[in-house]
Amino acid sequence: MCFCLVRTDASGKPQQGITFLLIDMTTPGVRVDPIIMTSGEHIQNAIFFDDVRVPKANVIGKVNEGWTVAKYLLEFERGGSSYGPRLKARVGSLRRVAAEAGTGPDMLARLSQAEADASALEAAELMMMSELSGGGTPGLKASMMKIKGTELSQRLTELALEIAGNWARPFQPHHTNPGGEVVNAPSGSAALVGPESAVTVSAKYLNDRAGSIYAGSNEIQRNILAKAQLGL
């Protein structure tokens, strides 16, 4: 099952005349093509619709008011993720790899700053979760969480590249599974090059570039905050 924002009325403003529709992926005319990422991994797909017919019962909300539904869901997509704990765990992993690689105090200081930022983000997320449990909505906090979480995640992939150095260069897809985890390569494959910790570094760096684009680019999130909070 997927959802789709479909144009049902073109007479008003662009955000009007949109309907939120659920579509069964087994419906005749639905085609799914893989999107190969710059890392060589298959993580996302492109969906095409060829004369697809969907029953009216699949409309969520009211016809022509789908943008309202979409905005509500986007708040939770942007602000419902718990970036903090995952990013703190990644910092811990990078600390261990950095120690093994013998990096200097500058890298350790940058990792400490990243850990502090992840802890601050986690605290903000916990505050928002408390508000959500009381029946609130993410609101503008969702935009802030999305910006902070994705940009800190990207910063950690950059630090990982620096720590790995030249060991991050070899492309070794046969040593990873679709989830990006390091696995034993099939019989006859080339031997692992470099430390295991460096195998997925480049792929994660490349894939994480999308973080500041999906769910509304970070530039758009800053515009939302500037308009609502600063009146710009």
Model segments located where?
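Generic, well-ordered alpha-helical scaffold segments in large soluble proteins
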Residues: 73, 93-97, 127, 131, ...
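Glycine-rich phosphate/cofactor-binding loops in nucleotide/flavin-utilizing enzymes
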Residues: 69-76, 81-84, 167-232
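Glycine-rich beta->alpha junctions and the first turn(s) of the following alpha-helix
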Residues: 24, 29-122, 211, 227
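Tryptophan-centric aromatic hotspots in well-structured domains and transmembrane helices
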Residues: 1-3, 20, 47-48, 67-69, ...
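C-terminal helix-coil-helix/basic helical segment that borders enzyme active sites and/or dimer interfaces
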Residues: 105-108, 119-186
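Short Gly/Pro-enriched turn/cap motifs at secondary-structure boundaries
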Residues: 10-12, 36-43, 195-196, 215
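Short glycine/proline-enriched turns and hinge-like loops at secondary-structure junctions
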Residues: 13-17, 61, 217-218
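A short core secondary-structure module
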Residues: 1-33
